[in-house]
Amino acid sequence: ESVDGTTYRRSLRLARGLGVVSVTLSAATVSCALTLDDVADAQAAVQRTRRLLDLDCDPASIRDHLAVDPLLAPLIEKRPGLRAPGHPDSTELLVRAVLGQQVSVAGARTLASRLVAAHGEPLTEPVGGVTHAFPSAATIAGLSPEDFAMPRARGAALIDACAPVPHGSRVRDAGSQRARAVAALPA
């Protein structure tokens, strides 16, 4: 991912290939541009971008529920419509969460950058400093604990979490079947 002025860019791993979403903030709007290996992935890329920006929330309902709390009410009034950022890729989110344990944000960012540089998939067409996609669950599952600059047990946990199971992956994403995901978790 990269940030350049008012534009945030990040790679997307999609069903038919890779892509990059560029989100630009102006005074009144947020615009989005997609660069995709396959245009058939456009709808999925838009859905992931909506999740990233929390565009499907209901700000009025959230305001109504949170504004009754005396501590939250002044904050809600000061920043109405504020949204909680999401993440477009649950595998990447899981890996980044584990990488961030017991290290600083800068340290976690460095570990993630090294992982992408060593094991990420190069984009067909780099966009604004984004050159690689985050490694897939299958790629991470194929690594050894020593490939991570962290304690061996944490690296092994990452590999296990990304390892395939008979009916898919332990990693849940939008559209995952909950019962199958729960059944796939280790005891």
Regions found by a protein language model. Give the residues of each.
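HhH-family (HhH-GPD) DNA N-glycosylase catalytic core used in base-excision repair
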Residues: E1-A187
